[in-house]
Amino acid sequence: MSAQSMSGYFFMPNHIILVGASERPYSLGERILSNLLSAPFQGQITPVNLRHRTVAGLTSYTNLNKIPGSADLVIAVTPPDSYDALFKSCRKKQFGHIILIQDWESLSDDEWQTAEAAIKKHHGDELNISVCSPAGVQLPSQSLNISSQPDHPAGYTALLTGHASVSSEINLMLQKMGQGISRHISLNYPLSPTTSADWLNRFGHNRHTKVAVIEHNPAENQRNLFSAIRHFTRHTTLST
């Protein structure tokens, strides 16, 4: 089965690799690893760090090629100049899914171009690439927080945005209404080849989701997006 065809795959990970995991306070790698460990996610977490044999008490590896066995999902918080080699390693190891998380607004135009070139080169049937804001991915029902944000309370609203700030605002509104999150992802719309339509299709019909809130993505194919919306609203209420 190709990486592209595995609907819902991200929502049942048993083994997650975090490339760029760190203990350095306030770094992106430290914040995301801390949230993964404190949620707490019940599956296996494997850190990748160039300098340390252990990170947060977990056995760490210097690169993907040294990790034994398979993994469901790779998370990378390393800079764009690492992407080309990282994607090659993912394909060699047959790790079919990777999510890139960065504070994109702090990066230079050259770094954006480096990221864009590597993503365009490697995204395809062998490797599915999603590009996220620091708000990343949260699945409260599975105690999974792959983001720099605090844990969202569990509830029945699926949230898909293109900005970390929008995710925070909607989450605060939901909390004031006494509501929580079933699934959340915050994409980098300009860079992510895996679109909001793709993710909406992956949301599928899920007992944990009664309504979905989506921030419109004008950068993607609108026909595909509205087709995904039509299919989704056959079983679940949606708001944009």
Predicted regions and their residues:
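Catalytic-core regions of core metabolic enzymes
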Residues: 1-240
